[in-house]
């Protein structure tokens, strides 16, 4: 069982360090008084410290700072907007930790591991600044294994200030937006929590999808098909021209049903289709796959992945299982590639080996010695710890995620799956029906991992020119609006739009949920009315902040700071120049929340208005002057300047609950409670929403 959070403490040291709350192992008081070990490694987490200490043994003392130790002040702004001088302070509560670290490192060689990203580099920079250590004291690795750690301590490097600056710029931009906009937001919407830079762009994406769904007008169409020899052939052509399914009208359907009595098989088209193995996981794809296959929210995935990376207690000792989990690189190190190839050869055979991966690894060895992209994909640190073996070492959830990572990685190094695709064309007069099936003739990577659970269907031995008597069938269908986002599909969209980075996807979603701007129902993300109101305000007053293009551009500029192509202060200053204009206007111009709604007043025939008062959002009838509370379980869409309430309906599918375990996407689509827009009426019919109808005191 994994008990990563429980770190054994040396009793004696626990007494010594009680005040400092520092994890310290394997060092006796005697050693300390003699000067003890010469080299000290400071890491952020106790679990990581334990794994590294186990690897390096007696020459090193490994201590943990337990997360960040220095940041912008909690009670002041901390940024001089002219000079961009930053006023950092020790995070309250961390003073004693810092004192302890200072004591333990004085006169010793200090090594600071930096995860392969900006945040890790910044933490190392804060520490080295506080401790006053200079020179080559940064060590880097993407996995906490004996090979990687021993290699890392042999090759320390200097701090990469470009990386640190990119992180400082991000911190300052977020600080400016949060600190400047939030008070304005509170002035207008008392129960708004705050505004964040990247979350605001994500909120807008979610609100826009809801609006799109609301505006969506379903289109009726007909599915027309024939059943022949176990095949389902759909109408695909009329008069020699392809017809889109949604273009099949009732007229066409009726005509087919009336006229088509027999069809002739005119063509069988057979072609080979190769399904290529997926790339190994990066942060975003891991989050999506764990959501759809395991039903894990992204925050849970990241928490477990971090524990697997840092190391967990197992019956065979404290061990790390995977490489660093925040990455957008699919690169695989030569060592890992070789290990995977050996594993595949031994367990599956040569035909299962990805030919291109062999070529790639040979190429890779030629370029050895050259500086390479330091980042790597998310993969097992040892492919020989198979999911079966890991089952005995890990608890259920850790094992599930590890199994997914292991399978995806092995699959990425395997050969393509090969399918034969059979298309059967049946003709009757001007109509052509087509049936298509795929038969798998070689499983390849699908031996260990599936992308889409495609069934393999046996092809049918049919003869061209054969006539068949048929009874065409048809069913009415209608187009459906785009789905609401799930956590998985939102991460995919954020990545596609270039908003956020591997380290921020989980935080973005969590922040929107924590602030009550978005709620999660049946795994889908639904904007609340408060979320819509906040988004409306930001759209009106700070259009850049919620603009996905602008946010993506900022991310690119931060990348350029990291690559040394831009100065971080210039990036922040040019942002401030535009931002200040919006800020001045927002400060000086009156802004009121006053939306029309489609909710009918309970006391007269008028419609309520949505307003904001001392206690938050409420409904007001301008006709009879009564007020009603707006209940939190009411959902709606703000479109134009009007709030349209959505009605919750029970849907027919009863099996939504069962599906949710296997597939987030499928449960999102078949959940048994859905919100529908009210039928737009011509004005005479009015309905009041039940959920908004409880009486509230007048404000
Ligand atoms: Zn009224």
From Swiss-Prot:
Residues 1-15, 22-35 have a biased composition (Basic and acidic residues). GO terms for molecular function: DNA binding; DNA topoisomerase type I (single strand cut, ATP-independent) activity; zinc ion binding. One of its GO terms (biological process) is DNA topological change. The record marks 68, 170-171, 174, 179, 186, 326, 515 as: Interaction with DNA. Residues 38-146 form the Toprim domain. It catalyses: ATP-independent breakage of single-stranded DNA, followed by passage and rejoining. Transmembrane segments: none annotated. This is DNA topoisomerase 1. It comes from Fervidobacterium islandicum.
């Amino acid at each position: 069982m994994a008990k990563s959070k429980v770190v054994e403490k040396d009793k004696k040291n626990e007494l010594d360090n009680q005040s400092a709350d520092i994890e310290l192992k394997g060092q006796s008081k005697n050693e300390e008084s003699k000067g003890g070990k010469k080299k000290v490694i400071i890491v952020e987490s106790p679990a990581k410290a334990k794994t590294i200490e186990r690897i390096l043994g007696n020459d090193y003392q490994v201590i943990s700072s337990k997360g960040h130790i220095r940041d912008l002040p909690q009670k002041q702004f901390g940024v001089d907007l002219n000079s961009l001088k930053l006023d950092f302070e020790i995070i309250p509560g961390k003073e004693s930790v810092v004192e302890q670290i200072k004591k333990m490192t004085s006169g010793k060689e200090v090594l600071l591991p930096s995860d392969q990203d900006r945040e890790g580099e910044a933490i190392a920079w804060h520490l080295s600044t506080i401790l006053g250590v200079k020179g080559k004291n940064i060590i880097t690795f993407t996995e906490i294994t004996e090979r990687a750690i021993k290699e890392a301590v042999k090759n320390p490097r200097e701090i990469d200030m470009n990386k640190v600056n990119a992180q400082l710029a991000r911190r300052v931009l977020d600080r400016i937006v949060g600190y400047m906009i939030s008070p304005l937001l509170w002035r207008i919407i008392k129960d708004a929590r705050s505004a964040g830079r990247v979350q605001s762009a994500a909120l807008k994406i979610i609100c826009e999808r809801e609006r799109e769904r609301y505006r969506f007008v379903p289109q009726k169409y007909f599915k027309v098909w024939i059943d022949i020899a176990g095949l389902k052939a759909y109408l695909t052509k009329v008069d020699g021209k392809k017809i889109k399914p949604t273009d099949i009208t009732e007229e066409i359907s009726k005509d087919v049903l009336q006229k088509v009595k027999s069809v002739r098989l005119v063509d069988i088209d057979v072609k080979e289709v190769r399904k290529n193995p997926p790339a190994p996981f990066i942060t975003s794809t891991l989050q999506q796959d764990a959501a759809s296959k395991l039903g894990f929210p992204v925050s849970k995935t990241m928490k477990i992945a971090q524990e697997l990376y840092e190391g967990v207690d197992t019956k065979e000792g404290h061990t790390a299982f995977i490489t660093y989990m925040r990455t957008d690189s699919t690169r695989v190190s030569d060592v890992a590639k070789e290990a995977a190839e050996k594993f595949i050869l031994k367990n599956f055979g040569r035909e299962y080996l990805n030919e291109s991966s062999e070529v790639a690894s040979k190429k890779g060895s030629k370029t050895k010695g050259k500086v390479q992209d330091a980042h790597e994909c998310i993969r097992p640190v040892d492919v020989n710890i198979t999911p079966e073996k890991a089952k005995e070492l890990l608890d259920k959830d850790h094992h599930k995620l590890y199994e997914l990572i292991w399978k995806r990685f092995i699959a990425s190094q395997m050969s393509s799956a090969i399918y034969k695709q059979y298309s059967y064309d049946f003709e009757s007069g001007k109509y052509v029906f087509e049936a298509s099936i795929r038969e798998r003739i070689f499983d390849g990577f699908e031996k260990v991992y599936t992308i889409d659970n495609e069934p393999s269907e046996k092809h049918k031995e049919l003869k061209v020119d054969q006539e068949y008597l048929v009874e065409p069938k048809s069913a009415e269908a209608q187009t459906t609006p785009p789905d609401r986002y799930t956590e998985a599909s939102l991460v995919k969209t954020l990545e596609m739009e270039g908003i956020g980075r591997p380290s921020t996807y989980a935080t973005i979603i969590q922040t929107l949920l924590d602030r009550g701007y978005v709620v999660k129902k049946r795994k889908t993300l639904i904007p609340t009315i408060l979320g819509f109101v906040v988004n409306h305000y930001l759209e009106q007053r700070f259009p850049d902040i919620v603009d996905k293009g602008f946010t993506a551009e900022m991310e690119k500029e931060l990348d350029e700071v990291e690559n040394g192509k831009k100065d971080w202060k210039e990036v922040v200053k040019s942002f401030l120049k535009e931002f200040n204009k919006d800020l001045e206007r927002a400060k000086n111009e009156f802004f009121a929340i006053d939306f029309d709604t489609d909710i009918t007043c309970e006391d007269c025939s008028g419609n309520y208005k949505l307003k904001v008062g001392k206690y938050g959002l409420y409904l007001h009838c301008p006709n009879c002057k009564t007020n009603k509370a707006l209940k939190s379980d009411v959902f709606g869409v703000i479109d134009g300047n009007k709030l349209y309430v959505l009605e919750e309906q029970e849907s027919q599918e009863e099996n939504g609950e069962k599906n949710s375990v296997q597939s987030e996407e499928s449960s999102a689509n078949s959940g048994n409670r859905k919100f529908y827009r009210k039928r737009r009426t011509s004005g005479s019919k009015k309905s009041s929403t039940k959920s908004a109808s409880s009486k509230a005191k007048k404000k």
